[in-house]
Amino acid sequence: AKPNKGKAGHNQYQSCVSERLKELDSFLGHRSPYKPEVNYDMHKAPPEPIMDKGILTKAHDYLPGWIKKYWEKEKDYPYEAGEGMIRRPDVVIVKDPTKPPTQDNIKHVVEIKFGNDEFGERQKNDYAEIAGGEHKVKLLDADECDCGNSKDSNATEVSTAGAWAAAIAGTLLYVLSRGKT
């Protein structure tokens, strides 16, 4: 799959990975063990996933709408972007895909870094809080992801999306199991 291009023409590999895993989750009726870009309310203990009201295994599609509807009405303080009030790991792997990605159902929180993007200490600590421990937080780098490989550019869009979602899911499984699958 080819990565999306940003406004300045830069490859957006992260959105490529996320889109493929979202397609897989949608294809599986929001029952995939791989949940991309789930937002977490860091002011709850433990941090709470922000999920679709009608489908508890599906991440909420529009964070600004959720903030306006819930944060601003339920909390005594305003939401401040960039202050770590909400965190969005790249991928959350759940134990039971029929349940939401709450701390007790999290197998791993995965962060994928491309280029010069760094995994800062505050981010690592927040992800450990989401996951329920540092041992559940995993880091993947660009070498462990196939976004950007254009060998199958003649494949149909649906088969390509399914193939890339399966490839990314397989890579996650292989890396996290240390090759013991």
What are these regions (language model features)?
Residues 6, 10, 112-113, 120:
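Solvent-exposed, acidic/flexible segments
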Residues 1-7, 138-140:
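Extracellular, luminal, or virion-exposed ectodomains of exported proteins
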